[in-house]
């Protein structure tokens, strides 16, 4: 056991999907996996292990933001030796060439969080995705006809924030805004693990367009299918 995860050694797979919402973790496990076992209920942050096409896969909720996902990623790596960590979440698009309902594969992530400044001082460490996971996910999306864009995202430290930097970020090629990817990629790099962030565009910051609850469920399905297909090869 670790401080925030109640699993025994061997209960968690080498590959873990990481939704922010613990109820979404439960939904993924019950909808897409077979032979499901719940290994964690600590603080209501559910974790499950099952199989997908015969491969052992786990799903662990992380909560929202850099501090919360950092807790779970650190413990999954250090206490359970997880090798592959894939965030499956949502983001807001900030470029007009990225559409609501698209899937973004985050190749890199910048941030206004102080996480990397604490570790590196004046050096701007640029964390990135694992290329093999990224390529597998891209190929899976293309095979399934899922609209997908690959590029940079911005990990914000606050959900309710002013948009003064959005235009500049978009000009520099940033595709969308979310709250966890930088932490995931930085910790994966620190510990020599593989990580990828797969994001559904749920709304558009510039246009105000939003998906309905039904549409979010459909595009969420596309994202999970891409994630599972990419790690089952």
From Swiss-Prot:
Q: Which Pfam families match?
A: PNP_UDP_1 (PF01048)
Coiled coil region boundaries: none
Query: What are its GO biological-process terms?
Result: purine nucleoside catabolic process
Alphabetized, the UniProt keywords read: Glycosyltransferase, Transferase
Protein residues bound to a purine D-ribonucleoside: 4, 178-180, 202-203
**E.C. numbers:** 2.4.2.1
Q: Highest taxon of the source?
A: Bacteria
Which Gene Ontology terms of cellular component type are present? cytosol
Site description Important for catalytic activity, residues in chain? 216
Q: How does it assemble?
A: Homohexamer; trimer of homodimers.
The protein's matches in HAMAP family, at most eight in alphabetical order, are given as:
Pur_nucleosid_phosp (MF_01627)
| Similarity annotation | Belongs to the PNP/UDP phosphorylase family.
Q: Give a short account of what the protein does.
A: Catalyzes the reversible phosphorolytic breakdown of the N-glycosidic bond in the beta-(deoxy)ribonucleoside molecules, with the formation of the corresponding free purine bases and pentose-1-phosphate.
* Name assigned to this protein: Purine nucleoside phosphorylase DeoD-type
| Biological source species | Bacillus subtilis (strain 168)
């Amino acid at each position: 056991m670790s401080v925030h995860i109640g699993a025994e050694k061997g209960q968690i797979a080498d590959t873990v999907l990481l939704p922010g919402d613990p109820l979404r973790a439960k939904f993924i496990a019950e909808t897409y996996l077979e032979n499901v076992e719940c290994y964690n209920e600590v603080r209501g942050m559910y974790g499950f292990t099952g199989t997908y096409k015969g491969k052992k896969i786990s799903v662990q909720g992380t909560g929202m933001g850099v501090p919360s996902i950092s807790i779970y990623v650190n413990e999954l790596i250090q206490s359970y030796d997880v090798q592959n960590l894939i965030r499956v979440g949502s983001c807001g698009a900030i470029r007009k060439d990225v559409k609501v309902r698209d899937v973004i594969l985050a190749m890199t992530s910048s941030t206004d969080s102080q996480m990397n400044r604490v570790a590196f001082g004046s050096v701007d460490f640029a964390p990135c995705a694992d290329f093999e996971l990224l390529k597998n996910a891209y190929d899976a999306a293309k095979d399934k006809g899922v609209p997908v864009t690959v590029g940079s995202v911005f990990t914000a430290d606050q959900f309710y924030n002013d948009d003064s930097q959005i235009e500049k970020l978009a000009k520099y090629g940033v595709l969308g805004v979310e709250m966890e990817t930088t932490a995931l990629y930085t910790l994966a790099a620190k510990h020599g693990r593989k990580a990828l962030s797969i994001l559904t565009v749920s709304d558009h910051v510039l246009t105000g367009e939003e998906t309905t609850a039904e549409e979010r469920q459909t595009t969420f399905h596309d994202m999970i299918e891409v994630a599972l297909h990419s790690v089952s090869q």
